[in-house]
Amino acid sequence: FLNCTLERTPRLSHTETLIKNVAQKVFEANGVTTKIIRPVDYTIAAGLELDMATTPEWAKDDWPQIEKEIDAADIVIICTSVWLGEKSSVATRVLERMYGYTGQLNDKGQSHDYGKVGATIITGNEDGIKHCAMNILFSLSHIGFTVPPQADAGWVGEAGPGPSYADEGSGGPENNFTNRNSTFLAWNCMHLARMLKDNGGIPAHG
């Protein structure tokens, strides 16, 4: 899970609470090893080079550390809060850096993220789940990930200022729609990842 919250560790992340409440539990109950990474804890340079620290513009770039985690994963879930109806600025930076690696090819000559499964989990206290999911899932597909059915899940409160997911009385953790969709997401990711793994990924023919 790439939790693109704006909150650095150890501050509370409502998005991370949703991750842990449902999808992570489903994965781990079925033998899938998981890891939650907060990109905001790292120095992620702007740009599309593999390592921006090799350019004159940036003295430090932690993105290669995160890219190693992505490379090792079969399933990558971009998780974000909603701000002004959009995914977080951290999520945008993450997707930009992932896009910068599309020129790296696997042994079939495909973009190196072929054969990986992508999905998204979103929280907020305003509208925007479907809008954010539309952008994130397209971006993952364009980069080379395979997106399963119902690969988005999330929770938002009532319109206007109000409690966030993990706040007392929000109703978020008890929301049947959120819990159902998070469960569908986890299972569909596992099923598709297994299908891809068993069949050697996406055929290179054509």
Where are these regions (language model features)?
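Short, glycine-/small-residue-rich phosphate/pyrophosphate-handling segment
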Residues: 13, 107-160, 177-180
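Conserved catalytic loop of SAM-dependent methyltransferase domains
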Residues: 43, 47, 156-161
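N-terminal beta1-alpha1-beta2 submodule of the flavodoxin-like/Rossmannoid cofactor-binding fold
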Residues: 1-108, 169-206
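Short helix/strand-capping connector loops at secondary-structure junctions
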Residues: 157-174
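Amphipathic, positively biased hydrophobic alpha-helical segments used for protein targeting
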Residues: 15, 129, 135, 155, ...
